[in-house]
Amino acid sequence: MKVIKFVYKRLLVRLYLIFLIGFVTTILIAEITAPKIPILGFHSIINSANPEDKIFKNQKIQVMNYPREEIEKFLDYLLLRNFWFLTAQDFYDYFIQSKPLPAEYIGRKSIMLSFDDGYKTIQTNLLPILEKLEKKHQRKIKVVLFINSGNLDKIENKSSIHLTCNDLREGLQKGFYDIQSHGLLHKKLTEIKTPDLIAELKNSQLELRRCTQDLDPNNQVAVHLAYPFGASNSKVEKYASQYYLSGYLYNGLIMKLGRLSNNYQIPRLTINRKHFPNRLINMAEKSYKLEKQDKG
């Protein structure tokens, strides 16, 4: 009898282990094969040949400066491969709200290119590249700018490190910029009092809309938010939802369709100068070709 019980227990253990291994394997395969959309998060785009053209001069964070010649190679590749450059509203409409995909995007890979903090080098170094590549490929690249409206420079001068309202208007009018919010003054939203949190969220939206109101007939400016420092919690999300349709993190993760349970926790890949064009291309190629109906 004891032998039978021992054999029975061993059999149960084996069956349990087989089930557990099968379950874990299934989860891993599902994670690996899940459809992905890369959402890349840049900051400053610099001219490496110009020693003055460095937003981040502190050695520890200089890595956030990305060379313009390298991003040009990457963007050129994306155009050659016919990528769809998503705006924040595109992502919300088609991958959160599950609106039917326009025929022109079916069968193409998609990517979102975002730039935080509103540095002047977006206008001086990135915009000319976007214009140059449009002439070359006869296709326009859309980039998402997450802007701290309180840090916008009021007047144009040589020492400016941030964009002006006129810069935003120019890029928007030319069809290159998708302008969204990054808070008012780049405060860590998880560490401030409720009135300050509301002010950060509300006033940033108001100022960006005031700047662009006559150029935004569809009210798509400042309807999405990227959290400063990528910092968020349930309280921040609660108040963000009163002003914005979605919220973006900065957590180094790729967006997996079918895995997004909260549209105020959209993941972004953190990009710095250590990500050479080939590495960015590898990230981009993880995007899958879109089908008629996909959902985050």
Model regions and ranges:
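Active-site-adjacent structural elements in enzyme catalytic domains
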Residues: 101, 106-108, 118-124, 128-132, ...
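Residue-level marker for buried hydrophobic side chains located in beta-strands
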Residues: 113-114, 179
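Structural detector of well-ordered beta-strand residues that form the stable sheet scaffold
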Residues: 144-146, 180, 226, 248
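C-terminal active-site subregion of NodB/CE4 polysaccharide deacetylases
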Residues: 2-23, 27-113, 120-121, 190-296
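Surface-exposed cleft-lining segments at the edges of enzyme active sites
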Residues: 150-158, 186-193
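Acidic (Asp/Glu)-rich catalytic clusters
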Residues: 128-140, 160-181, 241-242, 256-261
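Short loop/turn segments at strand-loop or loop-helix junctions that form parts
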Residues: 40-46, 147-150, 181-185
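A general structural detector for well-ordered alpha-helical segments in enzyme core domains, enriched
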Residues: 74, 125-133, 163-171, 200, ...
